[in-house]
Amino acid sequence: MGKVHVFDHPLIQHKMSYIRDANTGTKEFRELVDEVGMLMAYEVTRDLELQDVEIETPVTKTTAKRLSGKKLAFVPILRAGLGMTQGILSLIPAARVGHVGLYRDPETLEAVEYFVKLPQDIEEREIVVVDPMLATGASAIEAINSLKNRGAKNIRFMCLIAALEGVEKLQEAHPDVDIFIAALDEKLNDKAYITPGLGDAGDRLFGTK
């Protein structure tokens, strides 16, 4: 079973308090999501493999550490996942970025795929799927299904806020996927919004309703 990592870093929790706050405007909300995305990417990549390399400093030759093994790709779920991407890329600018477009059917609450664009070597990469919210789990499950159907094998999921129900459903559908969360909330309301949550992440990021 994949592990669930809930980050308790003080900087992440401080910024999350403003992200949740209904009085936080679009500009500040966007900047905060960007910053938390970068902080989370630092933690999500903590166990990447390193190899020894010989380098020469201005003083002498020495052995240093550099990343080895599989290369990274981040896959935001459109559209809200885009809000976390720039912060991630500011930390890992060489990472590839794919996109999976999904919308939630208002009647069934099921995720419907409408767009997929991935790096050609997706099966050779460490994949981190990115979405601010993990509510019912439907979007995350469908996005990971889509990736696996195209050959991806090493997948992680990263979000700002998750409901326990969504975590359980994602684990059931994809027990091989580790989940990384900035905050774990108790429940969903009757409209399948995370409670207390932060509202609609996409609307707050892009100033729409």
Swiss-Prot record:
Print the keywords alphabetically.
Allosteric enzyme, Glycosyltransferase, GTP-binding, Magnesium, Nucleotide-binding, Transferase
For this entry, the protein name equals Uracil phosphoribosyltransferase
Q: HAMAP family, from UniProt?
A: Upp_B
The pathway entry for this protein reads as: Pyrimidine metabolism; UMP biosynthesis via salvage pathway; UMP from uracil: step 1/1
Q: Where does uracil bind?
A: I194, G199, D200, A201
Protein activity control: Allosterically activated by GTP.
- Superkingdom as given in the UniProt entry: Bacteria
Binding of 5-phospho-alpha-D-ribose 1-diphosphate, residues: R79, R104, D131, P132, M133, L134, A135, T136, G137, A138, S139, D200
Name the GO terms of the biological process aspect.
UMP salvage; uracil salvage
- Which CDD domains does this UniProt record tie to the protein? PRTases_typeI (cd06223)
Family note: Belongs to the UPRTase family.
Q: Name one Pfam family in it.
A: UPRTase
Q: Which GO terms describe its molecular function?
A: GTP binding; magnesium ion binding; uracil phosphoribosyltransferase activity
UniProt KW GTP-binding keyword: yes
- Mind telling me which residue stretches traverse the membrane in this protein? none
Q: Which cofactor does it need?
A: Mg(2+)
Q: How is the cofactor bound?
A: Binds 1 Mg(2+) ion per subunit. The magnesium is bound as Mg-PRPP.
